[in-house]
Amino acid sequence: METLSARFTVLQEKLMDIYESGVEDLDTQIQHWQLLRQEQIIYHYARRHGVTRLGYQPVPSLASSEAKAKDAISMVLLLESLKKSKYADEQWTLAQTSLEAVRSPPADCFKKGPKNIEVVFDGDPENLMSYTVWTYIYYLTDEDIWEKVEGHVDYTGAYYYEGKLKVYYLKFENDAKRYGVTGLWEVHVNKDTVFTPVTSSTPPVGDSTDSASRAALPEPSTSVSPERPPSQTARRYGRKASSPSTTSRRQRKGQRETTGTQRRRKSRSRSRSTNRGGRDTRRSSSRGSSVSPTRGRRRGGGDSRRRGPVTRSRSRSLSRASSAGGGISPDKVGTAVRSVGRQSGGRLTRLLADAADPPVILLRGDANTLKCYRYRFRKKHAGGFRFVSTTWSWIGDASNDRIGRSRMLLAFYSESQREKFIQTMKLPTGVEWSLGQFDDL
């Protein structure tokens, strides 16, 4: 063990010489990491043989020395590959080749020229975060070639280019969800505001160069869900929008309705002329419905001139009766305005379902747990829900302190879709859920 202690002392002296010399070349940095690897090997050997102290230095555990030895080996391999590049003759310091610097974002890259920037969340100067960005970044390509590029900052985060690919190594959106409420932030460089929110929406997560300007643009739909979402435009009498097929049928019926109205006007004029001639003692009805020529009986309806305008659904039924030349059966009443499938039950059930508010599920749990669950079920239940929110929290009326656990909402097109989702969902441990409805989304 005396020989082991002597070798350990020699290693310590060589490391001190490197630290005191301050040489800033790549060969010195490679030598530094090789000495650190040998130091951990001695620690590991001593621990295996029951030695707990080498001189005044305590011997770490086997797992610790093994992990640090592997880190030293990986650093030696990286530095030796960098030595073969055209950047080997540049100035390299101990800080630039440290394990912490290499593993900091962007990971497995060498960085130079650190700069501090500040991001203010929700426009509150007290709610800010400080980030370290880099002026120059050295990354290894797929062909094992080192490239040197400049680092950049925009509203979305800090990034650099790998060829034509824009790679973000910092995204402010993640911390905006954690520390903010509105999801907005400002980027300050050298105490100057260089990027401010342009819209009230959260910036996208994409890697395009115009990601900040695309925040206000709607994303086009690329897939058809099992149940089509209702139209967002306002409808008369609070009626919900129908499917596209129903809308096209209504357009065709509108044309027939115009023809039916002209026929009713001609029929009323012929009835008045007949009564004036004395050929018919019975007064002709001038009500909103027409007389069926085949059955000779009158449809019940109100006088449109005395009772006001006929509602849209009623005028549609009248126009259908006039254009067809007869009445319709009771089970066909209202079929043109149904927006729920025929398999949904009776007429009352369909009307209640048609007037129902959008159903939702509220999840409560840890923020990271909810985010991981959202990532999984968006792949597993694709098309099985309408919307899913980001994680959010309640705050009090007197402070911005968060109350309780994080929340997340799932919205659905119908009750049946929500029930189907509940039957197949598997929530993580510690996540609770409850049902609810909104007037609109």
From Swiss-Prot:
Disulfide bonds: none annotated. Keywords: Activator, DNA replication, DNA-binding, Early protein, Host nucleus, Phosphoprotein, Repressor, Transcription, Transcription regulation. GO terms for biological process: DNA replication; DNA-templated transcription; regulation of DNA replication; viral DNA genome replication. Its main location: host cell. Residues 220-234 have a biased composition (Polar residues). Residues 195-211 have a biased composition (Low complexity). It is found in: Host nucleus. Residues 195-336 are annotated as: Disordered. Signal peptide: none annotated. Residues 357-441 are annotated as: DNA-binding domain. Phosphorylated. Residues 1-201 are annotated as: Transactivation domain. Residues 262-273, 307-317 have a biased composition (Basic residues). Pfam families: PPV_E2_C (PF00511), PPV_E2_N (PF00508). InterPro entries: E2/EBNA1_C_sf (IPR035975), Nucleotide-bd_a/b_plait_sf (IPR012677), Papillomavirus_E2_C (IPR000427), PPV_E2_N (IPR001866), Reg_prot_E2 (IPR033668), Regulatory_protein_E2_N (IPR036050), Regulatory_protein_E2_N_1 (IPR042503), Regulatory_protein_E2_N_2 (IPR042504). One of its GO terms (cellular component) is host cell nucleus. GO terms for molecular function: DNA binding; DNA-binding transcription factor activity; nucleotide binding. Belongs to the papillomaviridae E2 protein family. Plays a role in the initiation of viral DNA replication. A dimer of E2 interacts with a dimer of E1 in order to improve specificity of E1 DNA binding activity. Once the complex recognizes and binds DNA at specific sites, the E2 dimer is removed from DNA. E2 also regulates viral transcription through binding to the E2RE response element (5'-ACCNNNNNNGGT-3') present in multiple copies in the regulatory regions of the viral genome. Activates or represses transcription depending on E2RE's position with regards to proximal promoter elements including the TATA-box. Binds DNA as homodimer. Interacts with protein E1; this interaction greatly increases E1 DNA-binding activity. Interacts with protein L1; this interaction enhances E2-dependent replication and transcription activation. Interacts with protein L2; this interaction inhibits E2 transcriptional activity but not DNA replication function E2. Interacts with protein E7; this interaction inhibits E7 oncogenic activity. Interacts with host TAF1; this interaction modulates E2-dependent transcriptional regulation. Interacts with host BRD4; this interaction mediates E2 transcriptional activation function. This is Regulatory protein E2. It comes from Human papillomavirus 38. The gene is E2.
